[in-house]
Structure formats: structure tokens, C-alpha cells
């Protein structure tokens, strides 16, 4: 008798994706982050669902409903902090996952890479809207500042901002629609993630060497399921440590003050995972220029396959490109630090230098270095 997992129409799909999937035998722990992202997404949807049962999307009661969740709801505090810190874990895994794709040349799978970029943008939009929901000072002013950036759009800017706000300022209409979008977007992300996986399984996984692994593949289960469980254990250990011992470490103290349109916080800044883009935005004195740089800081990822001039796919055997990659990583960490600093000397100058370096590495230095390495291969 044939095994049901190989014949049943529905179970067969799961079998071909997670059990009998032919996988390269040499993929390292950097390939763990796909499954970790899936886990983070499920965790966020579940905790978010329970939070939505008690949350009120009204300007007069949103802040107190969060307080009620933490004080009165059974284990509400852990659900709230798991959701908040789960978002940080999500972005940490996202950045590592994207970095791995860049390092090992996974961007040559165009459909998978482009859907990944759409996923990144969607997750960023979802996280931004989620940050507005507690209706603290940083929620309100963050929403005001970021949505106001759209007013830089020529001709239709002001109308666009007022359309998004649902009025002439960030108010009840804005909060209600942000809650609606924040609820629906994770399910869209889930659909996109499935499509991402579908396209990946069309071509098969990349591997650290960057060469075809068709001659040497092993089944996903039990080899990589056990390997993924190790990564998952470490992720949950890190998340639970953060949630139970340092729940407010990554948050902003200003968000424990109810939103007040008449009182502006001294330093308006988003969550840590947006700081690199926020630093790029602030480094350009012109409003429209800053907004374009902000958008390009993410959309530049779509150009990476076009800028790939190397004869080798992976950076594993290209030391000069490796150096540039780690300089880029350090540059992003510098931008993250600058984004959290006040707009004053010397932070402005450091931010501008780091922003120029960020775009220069991707657009100019990486393709040039790859061409030099191609020449060196002939020697």
C-alpha cells in the first residue's frame, strides 16, 4: 500500500514541501532563518489575535485597553510583551535572512528575491501600524511624522496625507483604519510567504558554495527538521529571556505616556528596526529627497541582481567582496545607532557619511570589486 502522505492531495503538498523535499546536503545554519520567520509569523498572528479580543481602537480608550490587558487579563502581560518583542525577533531574523541571500547570491532566483522584498515592505508597514495602536506619545507622534512624509509627494501630497488620516490630523479615524490594516496584513503576509516558498521550491535551495547541488541532495526530514528545531529552541530561549526579564528593553519610555497632540516628545524616533532607514531619511536636508532616499534604502535590493557582475554566485570564495559585505553590515549598525540619536553635531555628519557609504557600496563598490575579482581569477 502506498503511503498516504504521498497520495493524499492535501498531505502530498505538505510532504513535498517539508518532508521529502530534496535539499542540498551542505546548507549551513544561515538557512535556518526561513523556518524561524515562519514561526515568528505564526506567533505574531496568535498573540495578536488574543490581543485584538481585548483591544479597543478608539482614541479615548486605546491606551487604557492596553493597560487593562496587562493588569486584568489572565496572562495578558505576557501576550502583550511576546507580541512586542516577537516583532523585534521577526525583524532580526528578516535582516539576517536578507543578508544571507545577499552574501550567498540567492538573489539570482529573481521571483523568490522580489517576493521577499515585497514581504519585507509589507512586514515593515504592518509593524509601523502596530506601533501606533497603543496610542502612547511615541505612537501618536511617530504616526504623525511618518504619514506626514507623504506630503512631500508633488501636487497631491496634502490630499494624500489627509486621505490616509481620514481628517486633518492623526485621530480616531486614523487609529481605527490602522487597526483594521494591522489585523488583515499578517494574513496577506502569510499568503506572500507561501508564494515565496512556492517559487523557492521551483528552483530548489541555494547552498554556501553557490554551485548546483543537484548531484548531492538529501530529504528535508529528518535532517533539516532537527536542525531547524535547534534554531527554533535558541530563538524561543532568546525571546522568552527578553520577554520575561527585559520586556521594555527595546521599547520607548515615552510610550507609557498617553498620546497628547499638544505636547511633542523631545526626540521622535521609531522602533529599533526602522532606525537605519530613519537615519537615511534625516541625513538629507530636503524633504522630498529624504523620502526618496528612505524608499530607495529598501527598493535598492531589487537592483542587486542587475548589479551582480561576479563570475561566482556566492561570496564564499571572494574575500574582497566579503570585506565589503561586512563593511555594509557595520554601516547599517552605525545607521541604526545614528537613527536613535538627536539631530545635532556630530551625529548629522556621521549619518550623512554612513548614508552615502550605504548606497555607494551597493551601487558602485560591490560591482567594481566583483569585476576586479573576475580579473584576479584569470591570473
UniProtKB/Swiss-Prot annotation:
For heme b b566, which residues are the binding ones? 97, 196
The source's superkingdom equals Eukaryota
Tell me the Pfam families matching this sequence: Cytochrom_B_C, Cytochrome_B
What are the names of the required cofactors?
heme b
- Which InterPro entries does this entry report, sorted A to Z? Cyt_b/b6_C, Cyt_b/b6_C_sf, Cyt_b/b6_N, Cytb/b6-like_sf, Cytochrome_b, Cytochrome_b_C_euk/bac, Cytochrome_b_N_euk/bac, Di-haem_cyt_TM
Residues the record lists as binding a ubiquinone:
201
Chain positions recorded as heme b b562 binding sites: 83, 182
- How is the cofactor bound, in the record's words? Binds 2 heme b groups non-covalently.
* Gene Ontology terms: biological process: mitochondrial electron transport, ubiquinol to cytochrome c
**Gene Ontology CC annotation, any one:** mitochondrial inner membrane
Q: Which keywords describe this protein according to UniProt?
A: Electron transport, Heme, Iron, Membrane, Metal-binding, Mitochondrion, Mitochondrion inner membrane, Respiratory chain, Transmembrane, Transmembrane helix, Transport, Ubiquinone
Q: Which membrane topology describes this protein?
A: Multi-pass membrane protein
Q: Where in the cell is it found?
A: Mitochondrion inner membrane
**Any one GO MF annotation of this record:** metal ion binding
Transmembrane region(s): 33-53, 77-98, 113-133, 178-198, 226-246, 288-308, 320-340, 347-367
Any miscellaneous information on file?
Answer: Heme 1 (or BL or b562) is low-potential and absorbs at about 562 nm, and heme 2 (or BH or b566) is high-potential and absorbs at about 566 nm.
Q: What does this protein do?
A: Component of the ubiquinol-cytochrome c reductase complex (complex III or cytochrome b-c1 complex) that is part of the mitochondrial respiratory chain. The b-c1 complex mediates electron transfer from ubiquinol to cytochrome c. Contributes to the generation of a proton gradient across the mitochondrial membrane that is then used for ATP synthesis.
Q: How does it assemble?
A: The cytochrome bc1 complex contains 11 subunits: 3 respiratory subunits (MT-CYB, CYC1 and UQCRFS1), 2 core proteins (UQCRC1 and UQCRC2) and 6 low-molecular weight proteins (UQCRH/QCR6, UQCRB/QCR7, UQCRQ/QCR8, UQCR10/QCR9, UQCR11/QCR10 and a cleavage product of UQCRFS1). This cytochrome bc1 complex then forms a dimer.
Query: What family, per the record?
Result: Belongs to the cytochrome b family.
User: This chain belongs to which protein, by name?
Assistant: Cytochrome b
Q: Which organism is it from?
A: Daubentonia madagascariensis (Aye-aye)
Amino acid at each position: 500500500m502506498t503511503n498516504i502522505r504521498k497520495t493524499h492531495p492535501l498531505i502530498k503538498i505538505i510532504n513535498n514541501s517539508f518532508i521529502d523535499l530534496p535539499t542540498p546536503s551542505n546548507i549551513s545554519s544561515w538557512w535556518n532563518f526561513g523556518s524561524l520567520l515562519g514561526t515568528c509569523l505564526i506567533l505574531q498572528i496568535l498573540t495578536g489575535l488574543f490581543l485584538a479580543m481585548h483591544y479597543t481602537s478608539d482614541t479615548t480608550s486605546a491606551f487604557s485597553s492596553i493597560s487593562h490587558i496587562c493588569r486584568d487579563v489572565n496572562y495578558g502581560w505576557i501576550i502583550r510583551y511576546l507580541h512586542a518583542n516577537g516583532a523585534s525577533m521577526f525583524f532580526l531574523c528578516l535582516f539576517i535572512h536578507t543578508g544571507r541571500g545577499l552574501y550567498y547570491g540567492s538573489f539570482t532566483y529573481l521571483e523568490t528575491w522580489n517576493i521577499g522584498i515585497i514581504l519585507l515592505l509589507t512586514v515593515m508597514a504592518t509593524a509601523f501600524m502596530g506601533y501606533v495602536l497603543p496610542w502612547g506619545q511615541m505612537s501618536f507622534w511617530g504616526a504623525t511624522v511618518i504619514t506626514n512624509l507623504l506630503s512631500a509627494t508633488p501636487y497631491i501630497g496634502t490630499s494624500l496625507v489627509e486621505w490616509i488620516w481620514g481628517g486633518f490630523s492623526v485621530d480616531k479615524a486614523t487609529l481605527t483604519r490602522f487597526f483594521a490594516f494591522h489585523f488583515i496584513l499578517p494574513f496577506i503576509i502569510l499568503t506572500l510567504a507561501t508564494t515565496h516558498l512556492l517559487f523557492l521550491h521551483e528552483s530548489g535551495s541555494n547552498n554556501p558554495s553557490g554551485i548546483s547541488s543537484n548531484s548531492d541532495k538529501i530529504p528535508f526530514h529528518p535532517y533539516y527538521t532537527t536542525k531547524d528545531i535547534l534554531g527554533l529552541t535558541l530563538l524561543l530561549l532568546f525571546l522568552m529571556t527578553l520577554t520575561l526579564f527585559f520586556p521594555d528593553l527595546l521599547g520607548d519610555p515615552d510610550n507609557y505616556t498617553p498620546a497628547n497632540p499638544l505636547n511633542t516628545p523631545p526626540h521622535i524616533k521609531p522602533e529599533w528596526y526602522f532606525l537605519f532607514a530613519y537615519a537615511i531619511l534625516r541625513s538629507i536636508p530636503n524633504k522630498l529627497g529624504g523620502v526618496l532616499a528612505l524608499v530607495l534604502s529598501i527598493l535598492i535590493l531589487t537592483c542587486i541582481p542587475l548589479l551582480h557582475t561576479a563570475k561566482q554566485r556566492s561570496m564564499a570564495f571572494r574575500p574582497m567582496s566579503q570585506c565589503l559585505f561586512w563593511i555594509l553590515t557595520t554601516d547599517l549598525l552605525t545607521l541604526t545607532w545614528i537613527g536613535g540619536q538627536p539631530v545635532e553635531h556630530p551625529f548629522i555628519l556621521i549619518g550623512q557619511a554612513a548614508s552615502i557609504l550605504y548606497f555607494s557600496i551597493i551601487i558602485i563598490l560591490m560591482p567594481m570589486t566583483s569585476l576586479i575579482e573576475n580579473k584576479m581569477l584569470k591570473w
